[in-house]
Amino acid sequence: MRSWYRRPDVLMLDNPVAVSDEENTGREYETIVILELKRPMRDDYTNSENPIVQMIEYVEKLKTNTISDKYGRPIRVGDDTQFYLYAVCDVTPKLQKIAKMYNFAETPDKLGMYFYNDNINAYIEILSFNKIIVDAEKRNKILFDKLGI
């Protein structure tokens, strides 16, 4: 692990709303989404330095309840907080081998991999750049056809 502070590329939190006659001091988030972006065709991953380990480390850091948002407010995480972790990268043979060690399964289209980690309440998905493009084209096909694009 590098000596400088590591953080995810994108961290999305649900917007908690509480109604009370007392001042809201913040509550635990129900859902946290982490998006990790990697350089296309990167293939220098190791068993200890890869997007899977990186994202799990982010969750472990958040679970310490010592991380703050950009306003300095603590990001409160509880035992029931659900995490959704997405790594956007090319699924190279090396990354595929590492993912299989974590019991990841291939998506039906074989363009990505996924796994649910019960220990940290996290759904983890590795999305290839090709999968994102193919899925977007499928999702928007009717719209593009109607627009004549």
Roles of regions detected by a PLM:
Residues 1-149:
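Charged, terminal alpha-helix-loop-beta segments
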